[in-house]
């Protein structure tokens, strides 16, 4: 599209207001109920069942303490009637086993239902979010979406939402149920104690609420910081060839590192808030204990209750308070999910009714003739309010072909966009058969149009599916007929899998001509009344253009056709040519009429003339006919595109990608990677150890009080209980600093670890050779997913969980020591049951490990589908392919959704089983205590102290093992991380013992070079290629599509290494030279220049980071870019937009040339640098290139042969060999020569 129209001066104030509005929007979070707005009837049933299971599960612990209290009362009075009381203890022990079964079933139901509904709802959210994005009009993508992170919301944000909807809701319900059940039982037992505790609860709630609010705010800011870092990574990896060519790896890593520093600062604040929040909560609970113990002793001494009831009430109330504290992390996760959900729900909520009306409202016509009229149309792009058209009027007669030509920025492509109703006129009307297109049903209207653009957007699916986008319900016969009409059937059938061949991300498996013919087949299948050709052959070489043009000629018959073309040879036979300049019609007429006038059109044509060859047309015509069928297979076989078919990829994956790492080795690697944070880990561990030791000592205090309650002397009860109450109050004072120490330093360690993992990953990714990026599994979407999701999993599942593990380890060691000290028999029996708990959780871990891998990869594939659709939104909108894309996205999500049922039940069963075995252990232990007391082998006080601390130990073991799912996920994420970190690149940019390059003369020689792409080793690109360009000279490489032209440049840049032979620069094998220092002497200008989402100034400076402002401006002047830059309102500070979208093709190319000028290279590599430009832009760019080429060794690949006539040497490639070599004049004099035939195809006159 002509982007000059949008590169004019923008309304800065409007953009500023939009940014402020976005900032305000980002601060929002959805309501708690809003999280579940994607639920259907089955989800409501699952949530109801899961909620019931979670609540019952939570209530079993308070009920456990009821039976426990009865058993304690029996044990305390055992001496009165040993036989009867022992029988009562046995009965209550059996009741505990029954309660354990209830716990087992409820835990199973709760975990499985919430895991399943979380997966289902999030999958639906992802689908609805993508549907809403695809339903937006193009203006949204030009304005609001330019700086947003749409893909981030569908991947990372969705994971946070799923976590909140699933596991964390289950946890919160369970803990809240435990809290409520504990207080209810407390009121029924000793209402005075419970009522007193209610006075403390509001303080705990305020502390927890404040903590949740602070964490929500910090997490929102942290999410934004990580999204910015992800955007940097995505931009770099999507343009990795440019980054490598300009030795920009270090700058990219530095930029990524700076983005991560913002998140690290927020992480410190998060740790501080977490430490203070959790510490304050536990401090209040300890103080509550002190108060309750003192008041309970008062009630016991005055005969208001007995020791067992008092103790049961205290246990229920206190453990219920602990449950409230344990719910805090899950509440924090839900708060994060609410923040993450805001962007997702806002897109869904604001779009559905609006988009539905926009697409489906309006009238349809019975018959469409195809007459199009522009009546006094005025238009300005929403993102750039300068007028493109003012009162533009013209008429395109039905069934006729109209071509629009003109300089860059004249509005050619804008006409095609407006005909498709991507934009609405500011004033005036666009009519179809006399009807304003605004009044027509948009979906129906676009079905009447068929679009073929310059760079056809193909999707990462089969050829058949890509053609099927043209007509949703077409059958295979219709697809084949459309392919035949587009001259595509023969080359498709020659492919290994025919119409089921995967085309790869962006269609990278196919050559330009093949992609274009598939796009034409897509348009043919649609059988449109109106055909729109937007520079449909401008990026093709002469041979491919001839075949594609024949296909277009077939399709254009009897259809209204609008053509925008840079190559004027393609529009010579159209019915009428419309010449645009400055948004106005300057000339209209046929080719011959306009040539006779000698106006703008004639000037453009003269610029494109090549040397006429009188006798070559018939020769080439015959040659093309013979090659039309066979050349297609050659183009696929030797395509310069670097990706392979997916079936080949599966066979040729690098060994390193298959390498498995054991969990222990990965954990050890992680520890080594985290070595700089060991001091933080030590300080955090001190806090965790102290926090862990508090709990068994706390249990000892309780047991001490319990013993005192059964004392017959009131003074003893008063003295002992007050002593414990004072100790607990003191513990409350020191608890806050202990938890602050633990959580602040562990969070700091985790944040620094994830920053280091992300940075190490990013650096490792950028050290790999280009061939590695060509693998489908290493596409940009997958790599950004590893950087974001997997690095986050490593931190949350391992670093964050380490805090809990150390705390519980301290707790377990302290508890076991105390238990064995007081009663080794009781401790031995209860401890003997622990292996059962561990075995149950290990079974759960093994099953989780089996399902997790496919689950992770499926999300990556789905994200790639979404990313591709959003990147090609104009094609999606033009073909009304929203439904097909959504169905493909749904298909990619279906596997993890189906697995959620199985994984949920396995996880729930494993966790429920561990809970059941825990209750059985307690029942066995209490029964055994009664036996020992009955046989006088221990006393009540010692056995209860031993048993109490073991209860706490069992809970800590269960809690630690409950972290198994998160740890397993983190371990799997570590596998992805270390597979990248441990991979040895095939082409090292800093090879040891390589020779530094300080100066390059520029003599380049290919010596018997053979080459195959690493992803498709069975296809030869070059066989013993010999080619040389002398220092300071220029070499033009031409040939049919797939002959290896661009591969020559790829090898010189050392994106790939030859399979055999040598590539030498100044007589030195390129493999012996330091790659970074060599690339600093080379400059690459590509067909589609890769600009970064920063200012024009910074894009030029990318060529030389040490350049001064004056040098940058001089480079821009040399590239004929200075004039258009200073005309912009912000001049050199103008933002180029994502991938340079705010600039026209010619402007982008001149900025890229300025970047190359600033590099001051010894060798210049031009890969089709002007092929995608219109004539006016090409002239300016060619002038800049001519200046740049002087005195430099230059290798240029060009489709337009007029651009290479001045080259010192022209080499013609065919089937991987040089078939002709010489100057332009020498080669055109060879009768029936390859070069002569190629030039004849591009004659205009």
Curated annotation (Swiss-Prot):
Residues 1-14, 610-629 have a biased composition (Polar residues). The chain crosses the membrane at residues 48-68, 94-114, 171-191, 195-215, 276-296, 314-334, 686-706, 725-745, 805-822, 828-848, 913-933, 947-967. Residues 647-660 have a biased composition (Basic and acidic residues). Glycans are attached at residues 77, 351, 391, 778, 1008, 1106. ATP 1 binds at residues 406-413. It comes from the Eukaryota. Residues 372-607, 1004-1240 form the ABC transporter domain. Residues 47-336, 681-969 form the ABC transmembrane type-1 domain. Pfam families: ABC_membrane (PF00664), ABC_tran (PF00005). SMART domains: AAA (SM00382). Keywords: ATP-binding, Glycoprotein, Membrane, Nucleotide-binding, Repeat, Transmembrane, Transmembrane helix, Transport. Its main location: membrane. It is a multi-pass membrane protein. GO terms for cellular component: membrane. One of its GO terms (molecular function) is ATP binding. ATP 2 binds at residues 1039-1046. Residues 1-20, 610-660 are annotated as: Disordered. It is found in: Membrane. Belongs to the ABC transporter superfamily. ABCB family. Multidrug resistance exporter (TC 3.A.1.201) subfamily. This is ABC transporter B family member 13.
């Amino acid at each position: 599209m002509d982007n000059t129209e949008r590169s004019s001066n923008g309304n800065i104030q409007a953009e500023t207001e939009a940014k402020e509005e976005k900032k305000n929007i980002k601060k929002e979070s959805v309501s708690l109920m809003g999280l579940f707005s994607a639920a259907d009837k089955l989800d409501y049933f699952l949530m109801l069942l899961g909620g019931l299971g979670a609540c019952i599960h939570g209530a079993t612990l308070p009920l456990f303490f009821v039976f426990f209290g009865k058993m304690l009362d029996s044990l305390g009075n055992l001496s009165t009637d040993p036989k009867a009381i022992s029988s009562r203890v046995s009965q209550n022990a059996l009741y505990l086993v029954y309660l354990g079964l209830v716990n087992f079933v409820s835990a199973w139901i709760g975990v499985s239902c919430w895991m399943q509904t979380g997966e289902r709802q999030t999958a639906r959210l992802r689908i609805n979010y993508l549907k809403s994005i695809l339903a937006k009009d193009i203006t949204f993508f030009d304005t609001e979406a330019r700086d947003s992170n749409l893909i981030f919301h569908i991947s990372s944000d969705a994971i946070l939402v799923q976590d909140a909807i699933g596991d964390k809701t289950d946890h919160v319900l369970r803990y809240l149920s435990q809290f409520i059940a504990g207080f209810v039982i407390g009121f029924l037992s000793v209402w005075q104690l419970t009522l007193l505790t209610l006075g403390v609860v509001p303080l705990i709630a305020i502390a927890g609420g404040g903590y949740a609010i602070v964490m929500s705010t910090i997490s929102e800011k942290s999410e934004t910081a990580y999204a910015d870092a992800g955007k940097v990574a995505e931009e770099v990896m999507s343009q990795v060839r440019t980054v490598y060519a300009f030795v920009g790896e270090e700058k990219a890593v530095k930029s990524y590192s700076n983005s991560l520093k913002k998140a690290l600062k927020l992480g410190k604040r998060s740790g501080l808030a977490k430490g203070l929040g959790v510490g304050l909560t536990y401090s209040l609970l300890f103080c509550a204990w002190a108060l309750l113990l003192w008041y309970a002793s008062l009630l016991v001494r005055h005969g208001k209750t007995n020791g067992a009831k008092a103790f049961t009430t205290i246990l229920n109330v206190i453990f219920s308070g602990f449950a409230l504290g344990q719910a805090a992390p899950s509440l924090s996760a839900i708060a994060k999910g609410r923040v993450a959900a805001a962007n997702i729900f806002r897109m869904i909520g604001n779009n559905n009714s609006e988009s539905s009306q926009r697409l489906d409202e309006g009238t349809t016509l019975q018959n469409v003739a195809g007459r199009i009229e522009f009546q006094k149309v005025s238009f300005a792009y929403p993102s750039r309010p300068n007028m493109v058209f003012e009162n533009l009027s013209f008429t395109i007669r039905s069934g006729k072909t109209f071509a629009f030509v003109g300089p860059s920025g004249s509005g050619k492509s804008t006409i095609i966009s407006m005909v498709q109703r991507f934009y609405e006129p500011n004033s005036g009307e666009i009519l179809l058969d006399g009807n304003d297109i605004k009044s027509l049903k948009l979906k129906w209207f676009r079905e009447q149009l068929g679009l073929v653009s310059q760079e056809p957007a193909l999707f990462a699916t089969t050829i058949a599916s890509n053609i099927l986008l043209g007509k949703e319900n077409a059958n295979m016969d219709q697809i084949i007929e459309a392919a035949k009409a587009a001259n595509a059937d023969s080359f498709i059938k020659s492919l290994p899998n025919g119409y089921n061949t995967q085309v790869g991300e962006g269609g990278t498996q196919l050559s330009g001509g093949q992609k274009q013919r598939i796009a034409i087949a897509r348009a043919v299948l649609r059988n449109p009344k109106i055909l729109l050709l937007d520079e449909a052959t401008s990026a093709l070489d002469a041979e491919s253009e001839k075949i594609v043009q024949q296909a277009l000629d077939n399709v254009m018959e009897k259809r209204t056709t609008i053509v925008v073309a840079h190559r004027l040879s393609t529009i010579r036979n159209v019915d009428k040519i419309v010449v645009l300049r400055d948004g106005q019609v300057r000339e209209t007429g046929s080719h011959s009429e306009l040539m006779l006038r000698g106006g703008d059109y004639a000037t453009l044509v003269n610029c494109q003339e090549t040397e006429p060859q009188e006798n070559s047309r018939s020769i080439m015509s015959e040659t093309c006919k013979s090659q039309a069928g066979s050349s297609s297979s050659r183009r696929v076989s030797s395509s310069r595109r670097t990706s392979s078919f997916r079936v080949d990829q599966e066979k040729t994956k690098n060994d390193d990608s298959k390498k498995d790492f054991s969990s222990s080795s990965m954990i050890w690697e992680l520890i080594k990677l985290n070595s700089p944070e060991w001091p933080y880990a030590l300080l955090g561990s001190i806090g965790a150890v102290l926090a862990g030791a508090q709990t068994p000592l706390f249990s000892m205090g309780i047991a001490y009080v319990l013993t005192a309650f059964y004392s017959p002397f009131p003074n003893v009860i008063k003295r002992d209980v007050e002593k414990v109450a004072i100790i607990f109050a003191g513990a409350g004072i020191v608890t806050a600093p202990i938890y602050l120490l633990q959580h602040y330093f562990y969070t700091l360690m985790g944040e620094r670890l994830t920053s280091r993992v992300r940075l190490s990953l990013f650096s490792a990714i950028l050290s790999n050779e280009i061939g590695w990026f060509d693998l489908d599994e290493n596409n940009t979407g997958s790599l950004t997913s590893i950087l974001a999701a997997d690095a986050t999993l490593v931190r949350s599942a391992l670093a964050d969980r380490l805090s809990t593990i150390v705390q519980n380890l301290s707790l377990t060691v302290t508890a076991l020591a105390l238990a064995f000290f007081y009663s080794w028999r009781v401790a031995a029996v209860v401890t003997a049951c622990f292996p059962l708990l561990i075995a149950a959780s290990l079974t759960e871990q093994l099953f989780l490990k089996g399902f997790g891998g496919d689950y992770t990869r499926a999300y990556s594939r789905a994200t790639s589908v979404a990313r591709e659709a959003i990147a090609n939104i104009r094609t999606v909108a033009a073909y009304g392919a929203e439904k097909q894309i959504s169905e493909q996205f749904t298909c990619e999500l279906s596997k993890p959704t189906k697995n959620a049922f199985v994984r949920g039940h396995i996880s729930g069963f494993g966790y429920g089983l561990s809970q059941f075995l825990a209750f059985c252990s307690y029942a066995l232990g209490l029964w055994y205590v009664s036996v020992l007391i009955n046989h006088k082998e221990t006393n009540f006080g010692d056995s209860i102290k031993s048993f109490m601390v073991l209860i706490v130990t069992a809970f800590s073991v269960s809690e630690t093992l409950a972290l198994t799912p998160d740890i397993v996920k983190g371990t799997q994420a570590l596998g992805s991380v270390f597979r990248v970190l441990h991979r040895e690149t095939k082409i090292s940019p800093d090879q040891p013992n390589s020779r530094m390059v300080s100066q390059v003369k520029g003599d380049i020689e290919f010596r018997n070079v053979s080459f195959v792409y690493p992803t498709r080793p069975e296809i030869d690109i070059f066989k013993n290629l010999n080619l040389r360009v002398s220092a300071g000279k220029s070499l033009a490489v031409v040939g049919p599509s797939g002959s290896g032209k661009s591969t020559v440049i790829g090898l010189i840049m050392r994106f790939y290494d030859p399979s055999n032979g040598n590539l030498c620069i100044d007589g030195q094998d390129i493999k012996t030279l330091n790659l970074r220092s060599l690339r600093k002497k080379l400059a690459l200008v590509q067909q589609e220049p890769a600009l970064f989402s920063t200012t024009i100034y910074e894009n030029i400076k990318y060529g030389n980071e040490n350049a001064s402002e004056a040098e940058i401006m001089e480079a821009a002047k040399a590239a004929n870019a200075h004039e258009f830059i200073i005309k912009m309102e912000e001049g050199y500070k103008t933002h180029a937009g994502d991938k340079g979208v705010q600039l026209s093709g010619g402007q982008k190319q001149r900025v890229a040339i300025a970047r190359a000028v600033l590099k001051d290279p010894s060798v210049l590599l031009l890969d089709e640098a002007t092929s995608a430009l219109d004539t006016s832009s090409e002239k300016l760019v060619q002038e800049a290139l001519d200046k740049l080429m002087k005195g430099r060794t230059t290798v240029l690949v060009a489709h337009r042969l007029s651009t290479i006539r001045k080259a010192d040497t022209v080499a013609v490639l065919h089937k991987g060999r040089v078939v002709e070599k010489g100057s332009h004049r020498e080669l055109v004099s060879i009768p029936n020569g390859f070069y002569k035939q190629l030039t004849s195809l591009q004659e205009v006159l």
